[in-house]
Amino acid sequence: MLKKPKEQRVEVLIDVQNLYYSARNLYGAKVNFDAILKKAISGRKFVRAFAYVVRTKTGEEKPFFEALTKLGIETRIRDLQEFYGGAKKADWDVGITVDAIRTSTNIDVVILCSGDGDFAPLVEYLKNQGKRVEVIAFGRTASSKIKEAADEFFDLEQSPRKFLFLK
């Protein structure tokens, strides 16, 4: 991996659900968001980070949201929708896309922490706007589309002990 220019202004967008379910399904573990944020920034000028999270009716995730805030990550919260028949949904794809486009004006590098292939067109758009786009995700669950679209893909599975809280 190449050394990152320290003058680059960096924004980090974290698709919490994508990383959470990948870590749980692959390792039965929780994500170390502090380590991921440090990896993303890599000594460059940190401008902002957003974590896109889902709130349930019980509110049990509030301490987790507070922990993210203490790391300097702004939480974007969406309530979990429950539909007739028991289906549940809390899709952040459009929200992440809108934020990426809206907030990247004074940014050199957008770091997307998600393996969701639906973001490949967003990655292409940002690159066409002159932004460098780096993707951080779990290689086995990340879409080949997003891996190919990114200027750089970092596979969290290279160092699971660093990026996960293993049991």
Describe each PLM feature range:
Residues 57-167:
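Nuclease catalytic cores that cleave nucleic-acid phosphodiester bonds
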